Amino acid sequence: MKPFCFSLSGIYESEGYAWEQAGKIWDLRELRGTDGYLDPETEQFLEAELGRKKETKELPRIRLLDSGNYHYMSKLLLGLEKEDLFLAVFDHHTDMQPPALLPVLSCGSWIRDAAGAYQNIKGICVIGPPEASVRETEAMEHVWFVTQEELDDGSGAAKIKEVFASLSLIHI
């Protein structure tokens, strides 16, 4: 299956991404209000278009979301899911920061926003942020962290196994 690519910044072109490897490309580079923070009007447009693409089966399950400035697209895509789910996120950031100014969706807040918005998300495990970032993050029910330090010292693997086992996703 070939990936569906969201082209928002031009990163694929600058990195020499082979477009022939992509299944479909949605060129959104001209869309305003998307760099790091998502304008509410643009968010409504994207939600409607993503819903349409899902209904018409134009949205395969493998998706490339551009650079880290557009991680908030994950929150919009999670909004399309109706079944219960558990999300594993590999990132060096918690992506659970409250917005600095206005209550807008951002690349740094999308996990926090998704955890609070969708009842079908039964758990989120964020794997990779530094311990200092996790300490600064407001705790939320059903959100777990495996820090970079835990990965480095080897204790992270056991913690990941515990998290998955507590959700009955694997049997120990």
Feature locations, PLM:
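Conserved small/polar residues in nucleotide/adenosyl-binding loops
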Residues: 170-172
